[in-house]
């Protein structure tokens, strides 16, 4: 367990004595017994989108372990990126009588009726990583600052090309994420806004003319779709040897497809700057090999710790608020203004992501979720051997 998680779980042990986060009354029952009784009789339902993307496997299994280590029972379901299946999976957990639902939605707009059923049975709902839309059943949202994810990518490109001092022009193409994923727009907007000044000045040029999210979106974040789209872009705008300086991809699965297209179809002699997000193992290998330049990493330890803290407070009858951040030990903010899901503004705990390049891979090892291979060249997932 990393330092962040240890701090959180230590703080949470004391919270089990509290009726809320704001006030604690006297309790003669020993803390350990109280915590075991409170959590041991309660079940958390975790709904993840799919096993086909590495990050959801990592998040799901890690969350399950952290909740179980804290004494909760857990139902964990993956829904194969099918909205109907996710609705059925959640309905099944409601029928099983779970005490709390923690949901990473496939499509945040498709769960309204199902979550109305959860609300009718007084089952609280926490949206994990992706905001769930158009329902008042969602109590809290735990994620990273998704606009900052894109902003970090854009600022990385700015610094790599020295756009504040170099005249350019440099050519850039964007690959965005799934239109059904509420986060995808934040990622794209953060990156585009960070670079808009240089696009307006003509230092950055987009030969394809694809400047809108809808033009560069990748349904289901599929690698094959990203490959096809970039292959078409290269054939249409770069086949004459026009130089591609930057391929800005919102995440690692799309970056994989774009990297494949560049390797097979790009006629230029340079290796374009290629961005990503998530810290997937194959992409980290590509970073070492110079195929991908960076990835934005969202530490699942921190996200799980924040989710556990919010969940525990809710399950114990408390009201999570800004004060909860003091126990996290991770850089985070409490946002009550930004995330309006169509019914209300959802109180949100937003953690801070960071940039990973070939020069700071050890930072991932320090999370405990990665390790160096036998040759100390590439990273492997510790989850593969646990």
Spell out what each predicted region is.
Residues 19-23:
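C-terminal motif of bacterial Sec signal peptides marking the signal peptidase cleavage site
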Residues 2-5, 24-386:
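A residue-level marker of the well-folded mature domains of exported/periplasmic proteins
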């Amino acid at each position: 367990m990393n330092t962040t998680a240890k701090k959180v779980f230590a703080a949470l042990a004391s919270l089990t004595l509290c009726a809320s986060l704001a006030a604690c009354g006297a309790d003669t029952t020993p803390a350990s017994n109280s915590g075991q009784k409170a959590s041991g009789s309660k079940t958390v339902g975790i709904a993840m989108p799919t096993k086909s993307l590495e990050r959801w496997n990592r998040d799901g299994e890690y969350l399950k372990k952290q909740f179980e280590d804290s004494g909760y029972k857990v139902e964990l379901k993956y829904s194969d990126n099918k909205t109907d299946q996710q609705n059925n999976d959640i309905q099944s957990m409601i029928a099983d009588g779970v005490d709390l639902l923690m949901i990473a939605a496939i499509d945040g707009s498709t769960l309204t009726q199902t979550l109305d059923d959860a609300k009718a049975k007084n089952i609280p709902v926490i949206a994990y990583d992706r905001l769930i839309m158009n329902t008042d059943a969602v109590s809290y949202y735990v994620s990273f600052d998704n606009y900052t994810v894109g902003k970090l990518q854009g600022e990385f490109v700015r610094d790599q090309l020295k756009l504040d001092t170099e005249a350019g022009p440099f050519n850039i193409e964007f690959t965005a994420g799934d239109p059904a994923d509420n986060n995808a727009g934040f990622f794209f907007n953060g990156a585009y806004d960070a670079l808009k000044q240089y696009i307006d000045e003509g230092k950055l040029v987009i030969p394809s003319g694809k400047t809108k999210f809808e033009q560069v979106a990748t349904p289901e974040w599929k690698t094959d779709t990203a490959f096809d789209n970039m292959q078409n872009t290269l054939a249409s705008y770069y086949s004459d040897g026009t130089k591609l300086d930057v391929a800005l991809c919102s995440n690692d699965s799309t970056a994989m497809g774009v990297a494949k297209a560049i390797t097979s179809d790009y006629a230029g002699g340079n290796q374009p700057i290629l961005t990503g997000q998530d810290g997937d193992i194959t992409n980290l290998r590509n970073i070492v090999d110079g195929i991908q330049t960076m990835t934005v990493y969202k530490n699942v330890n921190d996200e799980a710790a924040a989710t556990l803290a919010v969940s525990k407070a809710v399950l114990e009858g408390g009201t999570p608020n800004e004060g909860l951040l003091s126990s996290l030990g991770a850089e985070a903010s409490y946002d009550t203004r930004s995330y309006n899901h169509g019914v209300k503004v959802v109180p949100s705990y937003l953690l801070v992501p960071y940039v990973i390049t070939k020069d700071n891979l050890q930072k991932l090892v320090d999370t405990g979720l990665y390790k160096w291979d036998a040759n100390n060249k590439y990273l492997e997932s510790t989850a593969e051997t646990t």
